[in-house]
C-alpha cells in the first residue's frame, strides 16, 4: 500500500541495468502511473506517491563527496538493487542520508548471494533483518522449464550460487571459460 504524498527511491548500479531490467518491471507494476523521463520518476495520480529511479555509478576517479542522490528527500522506502556490485557501503550510507522524513523510513537492500557480502554485514551490524530467498524458493512462480534451462545454461557453481543460494568462496579462475591455451598470447 502506497503512502500518500511520499517519495521512495530505487537505486541500481548502472543506467543500463535501470533501462533494461528495472524500468520494464516498474512499467508493469505501476500501470496508470505517469513517468517523467527527465527526472526518472514515476508518480501515482491517486496518492501522489513518487518513486525516484537512480543509478549510482561513481567512478573511482570522482571524489567520494560527489553524491548522485543529492537533493532527494525520501519519506517512503529506499531500495538498493544489485548490492553485490558495490564494493563499499558508500551507496547505503548515501541512501540513508536521503531517508529524512516520514513514518518509519525503510531501507531494503537486494543482491545476489556471494561470499563476503559487505552489504549483508552492514545489515547485520545495524541489527537489521536478512531474508535469504532463492529462485528455488519462488518456484511456484517459475516454470519447470525455467529451472531446466538455467541448469543447462549456467556453469554448475553459478547455478548452485545464483539459483540455489549456495555460494562458494572463489577459487582458481575468475571465469571458468578461460583456457590458457586459447586465451594467452605469448611473444
Q: Where do the PLM segments sit?
A:
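Nucleotide donor/acceptor-binding cores
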Residues: 4-6, 76, 105
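Conserved RecA-like ASCE P-loop NTPase motor core of nucleic-acid helicases/translocases
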Residues: 5-18
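Hydrophobic/aromatic beta-strand patches that form the interior of the parallel beta-sheet core
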Residues: 9, 54, 79, 108, ...
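Inter-Walker segment of RecA-like/P-loop motor cores
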Residues: 16-76, 167
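Walker B catalytic acidic pair
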Residues: 81-83
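ASCE P-loop NTPase helicase motor core
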Residues: 85-155
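ATPase catalytic-site recognition across NTP-hydrolyzing enzymes
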Residues: 138-187
Amino acid at each position: 500500500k502506497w503512502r500518500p504524498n511520499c517519495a521512495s527511491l530505487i537505486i541500481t548500479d548502472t543506467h543500463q541495468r535501470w533501462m533494461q531490467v528495472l524500468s520494464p518491471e516498474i512499467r508493469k507494476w505501476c500501470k496508470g502511473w505517469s513517468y517523467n523521463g527527465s527526472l526518472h520518476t514515476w508518480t501515482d495520480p491517486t496518492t501522489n506517491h513518487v518513486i525516484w529511479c537512480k543509478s549510482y555509478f561513481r567512478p573511482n576517479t570522482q571524489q567520494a563527496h560527489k553524491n548522485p542522490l543529492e537533493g532527494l528527500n525520501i519519506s517512503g522506502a529506499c531500495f538498493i538493487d544489485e548490492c553485490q556490485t558495490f564494493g563499499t557501503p558508500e551507496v547505503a550510507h548515501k541512501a540513508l542520508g536521503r531517508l529524512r522524513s516520514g513514518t518509519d523510513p525503510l531501507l531494503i537492500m537486494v543482491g545476489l548471494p556471494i561470499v563476503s557480502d559487505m552489504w549483508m554485514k552492514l545489515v547485520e551490524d545495524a541489527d537489521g533483518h536478512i531474508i535469504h530467498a532463492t529462485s528455488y524458493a519462488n518456484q511456484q512462480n517459475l516454470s519447470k522449464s525455467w529451472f531446466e534451462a538455467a541448469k543447462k545454461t549456467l556453469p554448475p557453481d553459478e547455478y548452485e550460487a545464483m539459483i540455489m543460494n549456495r555460494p562458494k568462496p572463489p577459487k582458481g579462475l575468475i571465469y571458468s571459460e578461460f583456457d590458457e591455451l586459447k586465451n594467452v598470447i605469448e611473444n
